[in-house]
Amino acid sequence: MKKINKDIGSFSEDLAKKYLEKNDYSILDCNFKNFLGEIDIICKKNTLLIIVEVKSRYNNNYGLPRESVNFSKQRSIIKVANSYINYKRLPNINVRFDVIEVYLNLESTNFKINHIKDAFRLN
């Protein structure tokens, strides 16, 4: 089951990247990892650095995708984002945290993307 979930996650991230590129976002990094955690997609639009968490579901048994980006997950993403900003030497850059929900249909190739901009903030 873990392999299937990993495959679904990778597929969903690919769909999210294509969606972002189609909507004029420049992809800077994907699956950025360090000892603090991982960020799915890091992109830029105009002067804004956007940190994207991708969540997918093929049913609602476990709730909406965005519901899994709880407070603890948000804190983890923020820590990794701060470390990325320091690593890339991007001081004083404006940052936005987005969630992209990917709804998959296992019986067809249909899918739906819901892009939640500014899903959470640095506090």
UniProtKB/Swiss-Prot annotation:
Taxonomic superkingdom: Bacteria
NCBIfam families xref list: PRK12497.1-3, YraN family protein
Record-given protein name: UPF0102 protein Cbei_1183
Gene3D superfamilies: 3.40.1350.10
InterPro entries: Restrct_endonuc-II-like, tRNA_endonuc-like_dom_sf, UPF0102_YraN-like
Species this protein is from: Clostridium beijerinckii (strain ATCC 51743 / NCIMB 8052) (Clostridium acetobutylicum)
Pfam families: UPF0102
Alphabetized GO MF terms: nucleic acid binding
Endpoints of the signal sequence: none
Family: Belongs to the UPF0102 family.
